[in-house]
Amino acid sequence: RARWDAFVRARPEGTFFHLSGWQQVLEQAFGHRTHFLYLEQQGQIEAVLPLAEVKSRLFGHSLVSTPFCVYGGPIATAPHHRDALLDAATRLATELGVDHLELRSMSRQAPDWPCKELYVTFRKEISADDEQNLKAIPRKQRAVVRKGIDAGLHSEIDTGIDRFFHAYSSSVRNLGTPVFSRKYFRVLREVFGDECEILTITRQGETVASVMSFYFRDQVLPYYGGGTEAARACKANDFMYWALMCHAAGRGIRLFDYGRSKIGTGAYDFKKNWGFTPEPLYYEYHLVKGQALPDLNPLNPKYRLLINTWQRLPLWLSQWIGPWVSRYLG
């Protein structure tokens, strides 16, 4: 694992989601089988491809690089090393009898495969100076951040997951999305240590928002987060991302990765309002047993009734049922 991670960190195309720790996370938190492939020559790793198998009667059977992650796909020192791993992955997909093999990348890895460009990512360099970062936010959004600052909000690094889980689960329930388990977030903290951090926002001692972020090289990735019902009135979510930007800059971070969003959604518009430019993501598919590309996303009309029902669930019930569903939504 140390050699794998050293290779990932040394490659410019390496991401947090290529790290070997995801093997432990996916197996321990969800019980999914992992297949982390690598190519070695003369004792040196030349290519890696993290893969995990997600199998469910309701949502199908897939082999993905990497489930629950926005990025993945192969990393290689040369195209022929990459192609060798892709050949191994397609053979594995056939042996496992999956519906499809999926690669999630920031550039095309298998040009002959069908590709979906449903998602974009938002990444932007930040300054070491907080005032410069504030000035870089477009005027209208900057005014919203200032309202949060004036609302008496307070940010702090959280050592536990309870306050985060309450804010996060409230938010995703309201969106109609099944929540992940507490265990998943505990495992993330245990596996990634200081590279996985929670920032919680309070107002008069009450939690209003919280975000779990990943740190990789000089990058910060706010990945899971949300706010309570009180968050909207005091602009807690806007303040939260601003506070994270300040905190990350203090840690020497120079790239703020706002993560992926689906084109045409509210999250997409929110990130554009911060002055971030969308960059395309390429999700490529090799069909094995499947006859069509998968369409497992909230914009699919097939899931509209389920989403509407989920939004009306009591919070405690969504927290109990959610993990049984979300483990297959990788």
Stretches with model-predicted labels:
Residues 83, 93-105:
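Short secondary-structure capping/junction motifs at helix and strand boundaries
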Residues 1-44, 49-60, 100, 105-233:
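A conserved beta-strand-loop-helix scaffold within acyl/acetyltransferase catalytic domains
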Residues 66, 135-144, 297-304:
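Short intrinsically disordered coil segments
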Residues 37-48, 58, 69, 77-92, ...:
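Aromatic (often tryptophan-rich) hydrophobic motifs at membrane interfaces
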Residues 74:
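Active-site phosphate/ATP/adenylate-binding loop shared across adenylate-forming ligases
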Residues 62-70, 118:
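Residues forming anionic-ligand binding surfaces in small-molecule and nucleic-acid pockets
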Residues 36, 49, 53, 107-132, ...:
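Active-site/acyl-donor-binding loops of N-acyltransferases
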